[in-house]
Each structure stands twice: as structure tokens, then as C-alpha cells.
UniProtKB/Swiss-Prot annotation:
ZnF locations on chain (GATA-type): 175-229
Tissue specificity comment: Mostly expressed in roots. Also expressed in flowers and leaves, and to a lower extent in stems.
UniProt record, GO biological process: positive regulation of DNA-templated transcription; response to light stimulus
Gene name of this polypeptide: GATA2
Alphabetized InterPro entries for the sequence: GATA_TF, TF_GATA_pln, Znf_GATA, Znf_NHR/GATA
Function: Transcriptional activator that specifically binds 5'-GATA-3' or 5'-GAT-3' motifs within gene promoters. May be involved in the regulation of some light-responsive genes.
Sample GO molecular function, one term: DNA-binding transcription factor activity
Gene Ontology cellular component terms for the protein in this record: nucleus
Organism of provenance: Arabidopsis thaliana (Mouse-ear cress)
Protein name: GATA transcription factor 2
Protein family (similarity comment): Belongs to the type IV zinc-finger family. Class A subfamily.
Length: 264
């Protein structure tokens, strides 16, 4: 039978030329794998599985481990180089890297706070109104007000009637004498009122009676210098009784006068 134009005897010759000498390597690797499995099963478990301070096995441990495990020479050299590189890289770091960084942050690094802006604050609007005044200044103000007040009252006395004054105040007339009420002759009154003779001719009590139409001769304030208890009163009822008594007393006198002028 021809395969690709070649006869079977030629194919046999080509197979003879091929060399499968690597079979002993594969058999050796398989036998080495079985021995590695048995040796790994015979290893005792590690006493402390956790790594303390990043402890890594040394290069001697790697050599013994590589001798126990049958690995190709190229892979073993690569693993040995890698272990030496890791050891060198860890040797460059300090023993406690975390502690050093934390202390450096605490000692060297500082985070200053935001500086406060220095701006001028406006004074309180009601600071002046609530500030207490000294007692001497208040006393002086009251004293000065008491001095100027009577002058204002005297200057306003020439105006129209009905002006208010202090209680028990007395005024002088144009002739220089003391002002008196034309009805009860009172000199002191809180207010001078208009009467039948003009403005400021009656005291406050008589002026109120005159305004209401009840000013009669029997009426007198109790403070009037012409007040007589049997003839005057400051009560309206008492005044009406006095007027009735006067009328009763006048009737017989009028009858007698009438008989005297017209005899029978």
C-alpha cells in the first residue's frame, strides 16, 4: 500500500531512523514523582503555620526541599533565584514597617487648622442704650430740669386760658399782686379756669362748677379762705339744702315786707 507515494518498506526505514531515547526521562520523572509523593507524605506538619515578622525559609531549606522533590534542573534554578530575590527584597525593609510609618506620621506630619480670619466686629447696636448712667449725672439732670421748669410755666402764663400747671401753684397778676379766685378767693389751685369775668379768673373747682352751670354762692371749696361751715359746702346735696333753708327763711321776711308796704 502506497502512502504519499511511498511503499511500506520505505515507511519502516523512516521509523527506524526516528530516535525515541527520551522514554527513559519520562520513566525517571514518573518514578521521581512517586518518590516525591511518598516523601511529602512522610513530612511532619509544621508546628507554627503562621509566619511571624514575615519569616521566609532560607536558601538552605530551599536546596534541601529541591533535592527531595525531583524537579527539572531549569525549574529548580529558577525557583532558587526567585527565593534569593525575595530574601533580598525583604531584607531591604525595616523590621517593623507599620510602626515606623505611624510614628513618622505622628511626629513629622502636622495638619495645621484653618487660620481664623481676623475681621473687625461691629459693636452691638444697643450697647449705648443699655449702659447705666452714673448717679451724679442723673441728679444733675433732675436739678437742672427743676430749675428751668418754672421759667417755662411763667413764660406760658400770658397765653390762652386752660393751660395746665403744677398742683398748688400760684400766679401773679399784671399789677404784681397774687392771683385769686373771684368766687372763693383761693390763691392756690392746680389750674386756673375761665369764669364770668374772663379767662383765669376762677380756681379749678369753681371753674368746673361754672362750666356745668352749678356755680352758686353757697358753694365753696374746703380749702377756700372764705369757707364757712354753716353757709357754704363743697357737696352739691349740701348746697341744695342750704339754698332751701335760705328760701324758707326768706318767705316770712318777704311777707312782712309786703304787709309793711301795703297796709290794710
Amino acid at each position: 500500500m502506497d502512502v504519499y507515494g511511498l511503499s511500506s518498506p520505505d515507511l519502516l526505514r523512516i521509523d527506524d531512523l526516528l530516535d525515541f531515547s527520551n522514554e527513559d526521562i519520562f520513566s525517571a520523572s514518573s518514578s521521581g514523582g512517586s518518590t516525591a509523593a511518598t516523601s511529602s507524605s512522610s513530612f511532619p506538619p509544621p508546628q507554627n503555620p503562621s509566619f511571624h515578622h514575615h519569616h521566609l525559609p532560607s536558601s538552605a531549606d530551599h536546596h534541601s526541599f529541591l533535592h527531595d522533590i525531583c524537579v527539572p534542573s531549569d525549574d529548580a534554578a529558577h525557583l532558587e533565584w526567585l527565593s534569593q530575590f525575595v530574601d533580598d527584597s525583604f531584607a531591604d525593609f525595616p523590621a517593623n514597617p507599620l510602626g515606623g510609618t505611624m510614628t513618622s506620621v505622628k511626629t513629622e506630619t502636622s495638619f495645621p487648622g484653618k487660620p481664623r480670619s481676623k475681621r473687625s466686629r461691629a459693636p452691638a447696636p444697643f450697647a449705648g442704650t443699655w449702659s447705666p448712667m452714673p448717679l451724679e449725672s442723673e441728679h444733675q439732670q433732675l436739678h437742672s430740669a427743676a430749675k428751668f421748669k418754672p421759667k417755662k410755666e411763667q413764660s406760658g402764663g400770658g397765653g390762652g386760658g386752660g393751660g395746665r400747671h403744677q398742683s398748688s401753684s400760684s400766679e401773679t397778676t399784671e399789677g404784681g399782686g397774687m392771683r385769686r379766685c373771684t368766687h372763693c378767693a383761693s390763691e392756690k389751685t392746680p389750674q386756673w379756669r375761665t369764669g364770668p369775668l374772663g379767662p383765669k379768673t376762677l380756681c379749678n373747682a369753681c371753674g368746673v362748677r361754672f362750666k356745668s352751670g352749678r356755680l352758686v354762692p353757697e358753694y365753696r371749696p374746703a380749702s377756700s379762705p372764705t369757707f364757712v361751715l354753716t353757709q357754704h359746702s363743697n357737696s352739691h346735696r349740701k348746697v341744695m339744702e342750704l339754698r332751701r333753708q335760705k328760701e324758707v327763711m326768706r318767705q316770712p321776711q318777704q311777707v312782712q315786707l309786703h304787709h309793711h308796704h301795703h297796709p290794710f
